[in-house]
C-alpha cells in the first residue's frame, strides 16, 4: 500500500454463496467503506437498482468503456460482461478511503496487478448441496441456468487459494462477523496505521516503514 492510500478489499465467491448479502450487511455496519459499483451488461434482478447495485449498460457501451481503458478489470461471466470503472477506486484510495469490490476470480487477478496489496476474501458455501438450494431459493433463474452456475462453481472455487482469507458462509451472522474482523485486522497493519496516524508516528519517533 502506497502512502496516502486506503485498503482495497476484494470479495470473491461463486454465485449463490451469499457474497452480495454479506457485503450489504458489512456496509450497513461500516458506511466508511467505499463500494466499487461494477458495470454489467446483464439484466437487473428483482430489487436491484441502477447506480446502487450495478451500472446496467448495453454491450456496446461496455465495450466502449473497455476500449477507452476506463476499466480496472473486466470479465465475461455466464455470457454477460462485468467490469470495474477505475476512476472512483483511484480517487478513493488516494484519499485514504478503503474500497471494497464484489468481484469474480478473473477480475481479482487483474485488480492485483494494479493493487498488489489488495486483500482477497473468498466466500465458500458449506456444501455444493447448500449452494444448489440457495440458487433455487432465489427464484430468479431457470433450472438450466442453475445447472450452469453449479457447473461453473467448481471451477470458481478452485481459485480460492489465490485469496488471502476464506470464509465459509454456513451461518450468516458468523460469516459477517468474520468479514468484519478481516477488515479491522487489515486496518491495524503497520503499513495502514503509519499512513492513517502519520502525525502520531512522527511525534513518537516511529519510522514510517520497517
Curated annotation (Swiss-Prot):
First-level EC class: transferase
PROSITE patterns: GUANYLATE_KINASE_1, GUANYLATE_KINASE_2
Residue span(s) of domain Guanylate kinase-like: 6-184
Matches recorded under CDD domains: GMPK
Main location: cytoplasm
Alphabetical keyword list: ATP-binding, Cytoplasm, Kinase, Nucleotide-binding, Transferase
E.C. numbers: 2.7.4.8
UniProt similarity note: Belongs to the guanylate kinase family.
Protein name as it appears in the record: Guanylate kinase
Higher taxonomy: Bacteria, Pseudomonadati, Pseudomonadota, Betaproteobacteria, Burkholderiales
Amino acid at each position: 500500500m502506497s502512502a496516502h492510500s486506503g485498503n482495497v478489499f476484494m470479495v470473491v465467491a461463486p454465485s449463490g454463496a451469499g457474497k452480495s448479502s454479506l457485503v450489504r450487511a458489512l456496509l450497513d455496519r461500516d458506511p466508511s467503506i467505499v463500494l466499487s459499483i461494477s458495470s454489467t451488461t446483464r439484466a437487473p434482478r428483482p430489487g436491484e437498482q441502477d447506480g446502487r447495485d450495478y451500472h446496467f449498460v448495453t454491450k456496446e457501451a461496455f465495450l466502449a468503456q473497455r476500449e477507452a481503458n476506463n476499466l480496472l478489470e473486466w470479465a465475461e461471466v455466464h455470457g454477460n460482461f462485468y467490469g470495474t470503472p477505475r476512476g472512483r477506486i483511484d480517487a478513493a484510495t488516494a484519499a485514504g478511503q478503503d474500497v471494497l469490490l464484489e468481484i469474480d476470480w478473473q477480475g481479482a487477478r487483474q485488480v492485483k496487478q494494479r493493487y498488489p496489496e489488495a486483500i482477497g476474501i473468498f466466500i465458500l458455501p458449506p456444501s455444493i448441496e447448500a449452494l444448489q438450494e440457495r440458487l433455487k431459493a432465489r427464484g430468479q433463474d431457470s433450472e438450466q441456468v442453475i445447472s450452469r452456475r453449479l457447473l461453473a462453481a467448481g471451477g470458481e472455487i478452485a481459485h480460492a487459494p489465490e485469496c488471502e482469507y476464506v470464509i465459509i458462509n454456513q451461518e450468516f451472522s458468523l460469516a459477517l462477523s468474520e468479514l468484519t474482523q478481516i477488515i479491522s485486522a487489515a486496518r491495524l497493519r503497520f503499513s495502514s496505521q503509519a499512513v492513517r496516524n502519520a502525525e502520531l508516528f512522527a511525534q513518537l519517533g516511529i519510522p514510517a516503514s520497517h
